[in-house]
């Protein structure tokens, strides 16, 4: 699925129904990931766990932490933010640690 088409679809839903759709609609982009895996960004995340917490417990995801793992070692982690927010480095700590990023509007 091309990322541009996904963003266009999300924006068309928000345009048709209004901006307050966050209780049932969230878009999380994965920068640097190829189609389904690979690329120079993270390629693993707990999407199903986040979806289950949202559906079963009413806890909507404000961010999902994604990882790039080689063998049993985490090489990097990044926060995935609900669109249109994106991850921004705080300027302190390792750029390979999701805790050193915050989700905010571009």
What would you call each of these model-derived segments?
Residues 1-106:
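C-terminal His-loop and adjacent cap/lid subdomain of alpha/beta-hydrolase
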């Amino acid at each position: 699925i091309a990322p541009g088409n996904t963003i266009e679809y999300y924006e068309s839903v928000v345009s048709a129904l209004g901006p307050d759709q966050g209780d049932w609609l969230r878009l999380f982009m994965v920068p640097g990931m190829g189609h389904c895996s690979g690329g120079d960004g993270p390629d693993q995340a707990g999407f199903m766990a986040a979806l289950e917490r949202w559906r079963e417990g009413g806890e909507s995801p404000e961010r999902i932490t994604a990882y790039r793992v080689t063998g049993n070692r985490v090489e990097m982690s990044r926060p995935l933010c609900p669109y249109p927010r994106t991850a921004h480095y705080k300027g302190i700590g390792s750029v390979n640690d999701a805790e050193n990023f915050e989700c905010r509007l571009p």
